[in-house]
From Swiss-Prot:
UniProt miscellaneous comment: Exists in two forms, due to cis-trans isomerization at 2-Cys-hydroxyPro-3. The cis conformation is the major form.
Annotated source species: Conus frigidus
Molecular functions per Gene Ontology: ion channel regulator activity; toxin activity
Name recorded for this polypeptide: Contryphan-Fr2
Record family assignment: Belongs to the O2 superfamily. Contryphan family.
Subcellular location: Secreted
Modified residues (D-tryptophan): W4
Residues recorded as bearing 4-hydroxyproline in the entry: P3
UniProt remark on domains: The cysteine framework is C-C.
Main localization of the protein described in the UniProt heading: secreted
Length: 8
């Protein structure tokens, strides 16, 4: 779940 996470 970008932009909150890093696994975009």
């Amino acid at each position: 779940g970008c932009p909150w996470d890093s696994w975009c």
